Amino acid sequence: MDRTIDDPVEASENDWRSKLTPEQFRITREGGTERAFTGAYWNHKGDGMYRCICCGAELFRSDRKFDSGTGWPSFWEGVNPEAIRTIQDVSHGMVRTEIRCAKCDSHLGHVFQDSPTPTGLRYCVNSASLDFKDKT
């Protein structure tokens, strides 16, 4: 289902629980983090688009993915600036920048300014918050 940023997805907690696996719910709706090197996409090499598992919004292109050595899928740029929103995260005694899907407000991960990429950014994303659609 394709939606625009101006057409946000709203659902009840029960709706999300019925749509998502327990791990996907914990990460996307409760702000959890999967263990490094355990997610389906940390070492994924497919050619296509990574979408939000909750609403299907296009978030990251595979040609913007790189191996950061962290054990999570890492991208140096989102599909467009409006697809991902950022908020300050002060949990766990740290100050970080959380990234969320702009359409459904699902937690994706965090963005850091520490990568040797064209933007200098590393979008560190939980695999459980993503669905991959092959280009073919």
Swiss-Prot record:
EC number, UniProt record: 1.8.4.12
List of residues binding Zn(2+): C52, C55, C101, C104
Alphabetized GO MF terms: peptide-methionine (R)-S-oxide reductase activity; zinc ion binding
InterPro entries named among the record's database cross-references: Met_Sox_Rdtase_MsrB, Met_Sox_Rdtase_MsrB_dom, Mss4-like_sf
Co-factor note (free text): Binds 1 zinc ion per subunit. The zinc ion is important for the structural integrity of the protein.
Active site: C124 (nucleophile)
Assigned protein family: Belongs to the MsrB Met sulfoxide reductase family.
PANTHER family in the record: METHIONINE SULFOXIDE REDUCTASE, METHIONINE-R-SULFOXIDE REDUCTASE B1
Protein name per UniProt: Peptide methionine sulfoxide reductase MsrB
Record organism: Synechococcus sp. (strain RCC307)
